[in-house]
């Protein structure tokens, strides 16, 4: 499938999970997903300047009764660790983190970034899942959202190039 078709499947999975509020930071590999989110009438979409501001925005939306997701690259996740710790983890705010896994297998440009992503997620005590197969999109996104709601914590889904349909 091409990136636009893959983006449609990912956004359908987000909708199926019951999420209605999505904050995003532009990223080259996630551009098709973000465009689909922007055009989805069932979402309140908030474009961001920095990823960590999305943590506070999603926390506020959750406290107002919304189900939230934050879309970013793993470099942005690393920038957001303090905000995640002092907001979502401390105050038990579930947010679905959809993170492009730069530096994963076959991604030559970001090997160092890829090597620290999972250890950083683990250090925060955030559960995470690596999404590599298109046929697991709905199950993984919906399951991660259920886990976030039940645990009252953020849950991360790492999106690989193969799932995004990008090179």
PLM features: residue spans?
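Thiamine diphosphate
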Residues: 1-167
């Amino acid at each position: 499938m091409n990136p636009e078709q893959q983006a449609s499947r990912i956004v359908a999975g987000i909708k199926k999970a019951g999420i209605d509020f999505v904050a995003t930071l532009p990223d080259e590999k996630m551009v098709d997903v973000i465009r689909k989110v922007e055009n989805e009438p069932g979402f309140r979409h908030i474009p961001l300047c920095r990823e960590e501001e999305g943590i506070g925005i999603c926390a506020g939306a959750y406290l107002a009764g919304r189900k939230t997701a934050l879309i970013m690259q793993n470099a942005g996740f690393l920038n957001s660790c303090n905000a995640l710790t002092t907001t979502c983890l401390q105050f038990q705010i579930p947010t679905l983190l959809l993170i492009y896994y730069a530096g994963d297998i076959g991604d030559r440009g970001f090997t160092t970034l890829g090597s620290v992503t999972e250890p950083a997620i683990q250090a925060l005590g955030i559960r995470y899942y690596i999404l590599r197969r298109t046929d697991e999109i709905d199950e993984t996104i919906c399951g991660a959202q259920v886990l976030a709601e039940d645990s009252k914590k953020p849950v991360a889904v790492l999106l690989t190039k193969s799932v995004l349909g990008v090179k």
